């Protein structure tokens, strides 16, 4: 009997030691990851200081930071646990329902990775920088909006008003005149979360005239009615949806993406709030996918 107890005790000790070793390895990996993030934040902060008076430059710097950080996180071996990924996907599928399959594959990967990273960081008692969690979720949001507000919108305009012949009829968010007065398409990489309020017409650039803005609104309404949203919405409901998207995206961009570029600006509470807002409670991204065609 005593031998069985001793064997059981030894087996339990080995299991606890294995768990402890795994947690130690995970903490070490997270610390290395945090170090990489901090160096990227320091580099970004120095660039932001240089371009402090240039809003376009600031947006470009913040977008570059988001891209680099997301790429670094997706490459981390820490986030490849099959069990954690499977559980994260189950939760996300429950949240999105049938719309989970309508998300782009890159968006699904961003969301799964964000949830796994959050769970891994919660298991470590130290106060950590949760910037990566927010950036990954926001990259998923950006991927869905980029496809619809830039790619699909551009294709819609090209179909109805070919750029080569009717560029003047395009909305200002998709085209501009160069220094020689020639019409040019806006480069695809110029689309960022920071540009979404302009695409939704909740913000209008100062240089856009009232007449040009009216044309922008006509183009946007036509696209939203025929392509962007599910069929049968009234014009009032379409504008209500566009306004909500523009304002919600501006909110998360300022509160989470922009702050994530600074060291220790995003802690556990902020990351939890971001996840709640986009996925778990207010479900902004879940709502968008229901409204999109």
Show which residues each predicted segment covers.
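Charge-enriched, short contiguous segments at helix-coil
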Residues: 218, 223-293
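Flexible secondary-structure boundary motifs
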Residues: 161-244
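Charged, low-complexity interaction regions
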Residues: 19, 122-126, 268
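Short, solvent-exposed secondary-structure capping/transition elements
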Residues: 145-154, 158, 269
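Charged alpha-helical initiation segments
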Residues: 52-132, 152, 165
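Mature extracytoplasmic or organellar-lumen-exposed domains after removal of signal/transit peptides
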Residues: 129-132, 136, 157-160, 166
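Extended alpha-helical heptad-repeat/coiled-coil "stalk" and oligomerization rods
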Residues: 1-72
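Nuclease catalytic cores
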Residues: 131, 138-146
């Amino acid at each position: 009997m005593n031998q069985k107890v001793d064997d059981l005790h030894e087996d339990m000790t080995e299991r606890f030691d294995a768990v402890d070793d795994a947690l130690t390895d995970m903490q070490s990996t997270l610390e290395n990851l945090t170090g990489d993030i901090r160096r990227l934040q320091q580099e970004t902060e120095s660039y932001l200081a240089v371009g402090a008076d240039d809003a376009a430059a600031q947006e470009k710097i913040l977008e570059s930071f988001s891209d680099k950080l997301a790429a670094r996180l997706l490459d981390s071996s820490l986030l490849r646990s099959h069990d954690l990924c499977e559980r994260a996907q189950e939760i996300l599928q429950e949240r999105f329902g049938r719309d989970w399959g309508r998300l782009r594959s890159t968006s699904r990967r961003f969301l799964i990775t964000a949830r796994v990273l959050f769970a891994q960081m919660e298991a470590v008692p130290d106060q950590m920088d949760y910037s990566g969690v927010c950036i990954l979720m926001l990259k998923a949001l950006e991927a869905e909006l980029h496809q619809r507000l830039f790619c699909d919108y551009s294709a819609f305009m090209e179909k109805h008003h070919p750029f080569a012949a009717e560029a003047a009829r395009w909305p200002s968010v998709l085209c501009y005149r160069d220094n020689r007065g020639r019409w040019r398409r806006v480069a695809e990489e110029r689309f960022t979360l920071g540009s979404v309020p302009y695409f939704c017409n909740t913000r209008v650039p100062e240089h856009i005239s009232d007449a040009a803005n009216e044309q922008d609104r006509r183009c946007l309404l036509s696209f939203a009615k025929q392509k962007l949203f599910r069929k049968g919405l009234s014009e009032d409901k379409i504008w209500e949806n566009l306004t909500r998207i523009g304002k919600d995206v501006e909110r998360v961009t300022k509160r989470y993406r922009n702050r994530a570029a600074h060291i220790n600006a995003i802690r556990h509470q902020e990351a939890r709030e971001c996840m709640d807002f986009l996925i778990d409670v207010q479900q902004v991204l879940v709502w968008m996918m229901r409204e999109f065609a």
